[in-house]
Design a protein with these regions (language model features):
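Alpha-helical scaffold segments that mediate packing/assembly in large oligomeric complexes
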Residues: 31-67
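A structural signal for alpha-helix termini and helix-coil/disorder junctions
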Residues: 29-32, 36, 171, 193
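Residues forming anionic-ligand binding surfaces in small-molecule and nucleic-acid pockets
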Residues: 1-10, 166-167
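A translation/RNA-centric and nucleic-acid-associated enzymatic feature enriched
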Residues: 59-221
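Low-complexity, flexible helical/coil segments
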Residues: 18-21, 39-44, 172-175, 214-218
Length: 221
């Protein structure tokens, strides 16, 4: 369950500077929401840092070469509290991707104005309730027709060029855009300091899961 959003942009907006400006605005809204939530429920104390740290997936690999991508996220989030990891989907110096991304969605292959590859990323925080990093949003500047063709070729998916969306984009019938998804239940978990998604979202859980959570002091809806 996500709040999915898309915004029309111009060619000049397809930069890392613009991407990071949008990230700042989204993170600012999250901070404001945390403040208002803690104001309404004084037993909750804010823990998110004032600023979000930006780092490219390649830089993260170089910082923690012996760790897995998830372990790298844990380490950098524990250090800074809130992080935007950029360039997710492109291959790094070790020949691997930090994480997978579809070829026809985010632009993870364009070289930005700072020489780094990719115009997308994930908003992550250090979540003390669980003692690990926690993803709140995946987002990015979407592919233009050049990036689309390049990424389809990289992934060996050139046959997808014939699909409706792809043809519309390649024919300049769609606007350039930036977009993403913000996890509703995940954000509610963070705002209310919950450890299990079942504490804020109605769902079906096994008796074993309910008993385990009850023993840990968690009441599932």
């Amino acid at each position: 369950d996500e709040w999915d959003w898309e915004a029309v942009i111009t060619e000049s907006d397809r930069t890392r500077h613009y991407l990071e400006d949008v990230v700042h605005r989204i993170y600012g809204a999250i901070l404001r929401t945390e403040f208002l939530t803690c104001e309404a429920y004084p037993q909750l104390k804010p823990f998110l840092p004032k600023d979000i740290h930006f780092i490219h997936a390649q830089e993260l690999l170089e910082m923690y070469p012996d760790k897995t991508p998830k372990e790298r996220e844990d380490a950098i989030c524990k250090k800074y509290g809130a992080v935007f990891v950029e360039g997710i989907g492109c291959r790094l110096s070790n020949g691997e991707k930090h994480d997978g991304r579809a070829a026809d969605y985010d632009d993870w292959s364009t070289v930005a104005e700072d020489g780094k590859v990719g115009l997308n990323g994930d908003i992550l925080i250090w979540y003390p309730v669980l003692g690990r990093s926690f993803e709140l949003s995946s987002m990015g500047i979407r592919v233009d027709k050049v990036a689309l063709l390049r990424q389809l070729e990289i992934e060996g998916q050139e046959e997808r060029e014939q699909l409706y969306f792809h043809q519309q984009l390649l024919s300049d019938k769609l606007p350039l855009s930036i977009g993403g998804g913000i996890g509703q239940s995940r954000l509610c978990m963070v705002m209310l300091h919950k450890a299990h998604i079942g504490e804020i979202q109605a769902s079906i859980w096994s008796d074993e899961m309910r008993q385990e959570c009850e023993a840990a002091g968690m009441s599932l809806i």
